[in-house]
Amino acid sequence: MVIVRCKPTSPGRRHVVKVICPNLYKGRPIASLLQKKVKTGGRNNYGRITTRHIGGGHKKLYRCIDFKRRYDNVPAVVQRIEYDPNRSSNIILILYKNGKRSYILEPKGIKVGDIIESGNLVPIKLGNALPIKKIPIGTILHNIEIKSGKGGQIARSAGSYAQLISKENKYVVIRLRSGELRKIHIECRATIGEVGNSEHMLRILGKAGASRRYGIRPTVRGTAMNPVDHPHGGGEGRNFGKHPVSPWGLKTKGKKTRRNKRTERFIVRHRNK
């Protein structure tokens, strides 16, 4: 990774910090592993905004990532490391011995030419995917399944990982980077290692136009709006004189937002405790 701080030749370049990966493949992705991605602009089928601050952005094609690691006990060689516009981490193209190709998340430290594998009896090696019951305590993991066979859902963004803490009967306990301790079934799979491109957090876009290219629209403060648009709006000056609330009048800043009580029993310790 190379971190480049741009010279202040203009106000838009003054604060820009780029994270450059010199080993990224510069050609086109594999066409058979691409899908069309339709933008919604944060709207639902009625045309109403369901997610704010989304809209515009550069056109993207979705890279089909193999979160399940479908081909067991078939060695695969890492062909190249590629950029993926749909996620913060990079991806790698792997070629299986049976001739199949797949995209998977890039484990930190993987190199072109490395051999990786998935299955129940594969060794504990960077990039290998296997059931958590076969992995020793203290191992760093990523792309962890919540439900066996569904594919990895935990620790998939750039630089993220989880650590295996303990094993208890049919469940293991992992510690996430947020500090949360969570139970995972022993049959669920995980990949050895940490997700690559951990320097992604150091980048600074530097100007509003760069955010718009990523499809991020401006975030306007409630106190800067009119009373018709937000409970904090209107008045003389900037003081809104009440407890902070959302645009719909619900309390914010500290209010619990988790609703899925069914899976609450799998959380041993919450991240904020």
From Swiss-Prot:
Q: Could you cite one Gene Ontology molecular function of this protein?
A: structural constituent of ribosome
Top-level division of the source organism's lineage? Bacteria
One GO cellular component, as annotated:
large ribosomal subunit
Which portions of the sequence form the region Disordered? 221-263
Give the SMART domains listed for this entry: Ribosomal_L2, Ribosomal_L2_C
State whether keyword Hydrolase applies.
Answer: no
* GO BP annotations, alphabetical order: cytoplasmic translation
Q: Which InterPro entries match?
A: NA-bd_OB-fold, Rib_uL2_dom2, Ribosomal_uL2, Ribosomal_uL2_bac/org-type, Ribosomal_uL2_C, Ribosomal_uL2_CS, Ribosomal_uL2_dom3, Ribosomal_uL2_RNA-bd_dom
Q: Please note every region of biased composition (Basic residues).
A: 252-263
Which key words are in the record?
A: Ribonucleoprotein, Ribosomal protein, RNA-binding, rRNA-binding
Give the family per the record: Belongs to the universal ribosomal protein uL2 family.
Whom does it interact with, and what assembly results? Part of the 50S ribosomal subunit. Forms a bridge to the 30S subunit in the 70S ribosome.
User: What is the role of this chain?
Assistant: One of the primary rRNA binding proteins. Required for association of the 30S and 50S subunits to form the 70S ribosome, for tRNA binding and peptide bond formation. It has been suggested to have peptidyltransferase activity; this is somewhat controversial. Makes several contacts with the 16S rRNA in the 70S ribosome.
NCBIfam families in alphabetical order: rplB_bact (TIGR01171)
In Swiss-Prot or TrEMBL terms, this protein is called Large ribosomal subunit protein uL2
Q: Which organism is it from?
A: Buchnera aphidicola subsp. Cinara cedri (strain Cc)
For this protein's source organism, the top of the classification is: Bacteria, Pseudomonadati, Pseudomonadota, Gammaproteobacteria, Enterobacterales
The record's gene field reads: rplB
